[in-house]
Each structure stands twice: as C-alpha cells, then as structure tokens.
Regions:
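Aromatic-lined carbohydrate-recognition surfaces of secreted/lumenal glycan-active proteins
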Residues: 138-158, 171-173, 177, 205
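Substrate-binding cleft of extracellular glycoside hydrolase catalytic domains
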Residues: 2-130, 136
Length: 246
C-alpha cells in the first residue's frame, strides 16, 4: 500500500499517552488532530485546550484541524450562521493569537460539523451566513469553510450545492463512513465517501473508523488523490510550543 497520511480526532484533550496509542493502532504517527472550537467563552474539555495540548502536539509535529461545533444550529437561518461563524473564527483566532496565525501563513481550513440527523442537517441559508461570519472575524486571518458530514445525507449536500451555485465557497469535505470490522491499514474507497448527490467540492478526508480495537480515537485518512502537504496540512494549524492566550 502506498504511503498513507492519517489523523485522529477526539472530544477531549490530547495527551502524550493518547498520541502513543493512536500511533500504535494507525501504524504511523497522526499528521493532524481534529479538535472542537465553538466560542471564545466556551469551557470544558470538549473544546481545544491549548494550555494542555499545544506543547504535546507540537512535540510530535501534529497539526490542529479546527472543527466548528454547533451541530443543532446548522439547519437555521442566515443570522444564526453569521453569529456562529463569527464565534467559531473568533475562538480559533483568540486561542492561537492573530499574529501567530499570520506568521504561519494566515489561511486555514475550518470544518463545520454536520451530523446528518435530527436538527443537524445543513440549510443553504445557515451555510451562507456561516461563511460570512467566518470572514468578519479578521482582516488578516482567513478561515476557509469546509464541511464534515455523512455521504448519504442528501439534504445537507443539496443545500450545500445550492450555496455553491450562488457563489458561496466550500474548500473541501470530510466524509464520515466508519468501518466496523476492517483491519488497518485501511485503503481509500471512493465509493464509500462520495456525497450523494455529488456537488463538486473536493473530498479531502475520510473518517473511516470510530473508537475500537482499544483505541479511543476517531481515525481519518487523507484522500490519496490530493497532495497531503500542499492541499491539506498546509491549511491546518501548527500549534505553538507555548501560547499566552487562554
């Protein structure tokens, strides 16, 4: 199997022991780690906690993949999207510092978490507002809108396609189709990750496994059709060894 670029995501802080466990089950070190961002005021370990996580991730050259977390809001209107987009972007910028992010290139992906059931199905209006809210947070840092979702969530992909048709950007998709029995290393499978309907946005990542086999991480694989460094990792955030902000 060709070289694989893989990563993890969790709803709790990254530790040295967790990285060791993840590397053991993945077969290679994770190149990125997905963590949640919602608002600068949100507390709790579900959110990224840089005072705990920055140094350990930096020591292993693991980049942070920001996930925008307000799953029950994503079917709302433009105003809700604007509010959440501004809050998500402000959280990322306040966490790492605007000047630091500018020094690291100033342009990064952020993935909107759409779980594909109940209230968590995307609306065109919400996505349009969310993208606008992201852009309002800073004149110096660009957070590029991406979407995490389920391949079969037709309501979400239809809504996103409408937004794209009206010129609203989407920089990429992270598709969740977890496997239940397959062993590592897992190979990319286009048939399992294609959104239905297809909207033309690039599929960057496949979340192919939830916690199992003794590993308490979600696992994701980078699409081998893209250049992992240039097309994905360059747009994820390298955490600083030390950072003064809360």
């Amino acid at each position: 199997m060709p070289d694989r670029t893989v990563g993890a995501d969790t709803a709790y802080p990254v530790t040295e022991a967790l990285i060791t466990s993840a590397t053991a089950v993945l077969g290679v070190a994770p190149a990125f780690w997905g963590r949640y961002f919602s608002t600068p005021q949100t507390v709790g370990d579900v959110e990224y906690r840089h005072r705990v996580e920055d140094a350990v991730l930096a020591a292993h050259n693991i980049r942070v993949l920001p996930i925008a977390r307000q799953t029950n809001n994503v079917g709302g209107g433009v105003a809700a999207g604007q509010r959440d987009g501004l809050a998500n972007a402000s959280d990322v910028i306040d966490t790492f510092g605007e000047s630091y992010l500018v020094d690291q290139g100033g342009t990064f992906f952020i993935f909107l978490d759409v779980e594909g059931s109940g209230q968590s199905r995307l609306s065109t209006d919400y996505y349009t507002g969310w993208v606008d809210g992201l852009a309002q947070a800073s004149k110096n840092v660009d957070l590029l809108p991406c979407v995490y979702g389920l391949p079969g969530d037709a309501a979400t992909w239809t809504a996103l396609a409408r937004a794209l048709a009206h010129g609203v950007p989407c920089s990429g998709l992270w598709m969740s189709h977890p496997l239940l029995t397959e062993a590592e290393p897992v190979a990319w499978n286009n048939a399992l990750v294609a959104p239905k309907p297809d909207l033309g946005a690039p599929v960057l990542l496949w979340q192919y496994m939830f916690p199992r086999d003794g590993a308490s991480i979600d696992r994701s694989l980078v699409n081998p059709a893209i250049h992992a460094q240039n097309d994905l990792l360059a747009f994820l955030i390298p955490p600083p060894v030390a950072q003064p902000n809360a």
